[in-house]
Amino acid sequence: LSGLTCSHLNVMEKGEYRKKAAELGMAIICPDTSPRGEDIPDENGNWQFGSGAGFYLDATESPYDKNYNMYSYIVDELPSVIEKYFDFDMSRQSIFGHSMGGHGAIIMALRNPNKFKSCSAFAPIVEPSTASWSSGAFKKYIGLDQTNWQMYDSVALVKKGYHFPEILVDQGD
């Protein structure tokens, strides 16, 4: 999963994994970070919100609730489409991401431990509900009640008892 201000192209173009994945017979699926072209107010005017900043959640606030459902898209809809059209062993699917994508990977793995074989996060956002630059997006997408934000915050999920066997987190040097 790509990071904040990015799109699916970041993973596809910058990752040095393609040759090795091909050798191993692995498919790498690169979904976008948010819906595109919905002409929602402020969708493209702020790097902290809208296109490129979907935070891998399911919005509950209008007008975002119609299309900003990246959590359900990645956990449910996309795997169903993949399973329907490709002969992949879905019992071996894993999830990984960078920055905001690392946040998405962790929350999806924590909330769906039987769906993913592994989870890796590179420089992930781990507590978006407390950061000033992401809490604004949470308010617009999920509303003012911060208890609703906890389902999209990995620290809050761990405190609530959500668990995934092992998560690789790399912050770099």
Which positions does each model-derived feature cover?
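Non-catalytic cap/lid and distal C-terminal segments of serine-dependent acyl enzymes
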Residues: 1-173
